[in-house]
Each structure stands twice: as structure tokens, then as C-alpha cells.
Amino acid sequence: MSYFKGVSIAKAANILYDGNITSRAITFEDGSKKTLGIMLAGEYELNTVNKEIIDIQRGKIDLLLPANEWQEFEGPASFTIPANTKFKLRVHSLVDYCCSFIKE
């Protein structure tokens, strides 16, 4: 989906790693949430609360989930992170992404 309709958008950005990862939260009429963001090149460790589906619009990223090998993704691509998971990212180039939060 290239466009979202009927959403509320947070004015304030979520800023992580001194601005190397930024996103804006959007909430849909049904209460579901996504973030739209940018990641700059670097290595990061993040955590999930809910299951997340990350859609890479453009850019190249490596993902390391617990008990797995590094996996490479280049946009357009998507991957899923389970709930309550600590994971690592190696971002090779500017990444434009959309993250969907899935409550289970």
C-alpha cells in the first residue's frame, strides 16, 4: 500500500541512536499502529514488545534474530520480528521503512 487514509500522525518523532533512527507513529481508525521512518548506516540493537512486520521501501539491511544467522534484505523487502525479541541490525545505506505492530 503506497498511501494510508483515515490516520492520525504524531507530530513528534521517535528518535533513537542520536537521530540515526527516526520515525513517526501513525494510528488508524481501527486502532492499529504503524511507524514510518528512516535509518542511517550503522549497527543497532533493538527490542520488540509486539510482533513487528518491517517493510523496507529502499536501502540495504542485515538482520540478526536470536539463534539465527545474519539475513540480508534489500528494498523492497519485508521481514517479521516476533514479540518480545531483542535483535540486531546492520544498516548499509539509508533505509526507508514502514513498521507494522501486530498485537497477538
Q: Where on the chain are the PLM-derived regions?
A:
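Short, conserved beta-strand element in jelly-roll/cupin
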Residues: 48-62
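A short, N-terminal "cap"/entry segment at the start of jelly-roll beta-barrel domains
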Residues: 1-32
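Ligand-binding loop in jelly-roll beta-barrel domains
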Residues: 82-104
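Residue-level recognition of conserved beta-strand positions in structured domain cores
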Residues: 38, 48, 65, 91, ...
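Compact, glycine-rich, soluble single-domain proteins
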Residues: 22, 26, 37-46, 65
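General beta-strand recognition
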Residues: 35, 45, 62, 88, ...
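Short acidic-glycine-tyrosine-enriched beta hairpin
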Residues: 67-87
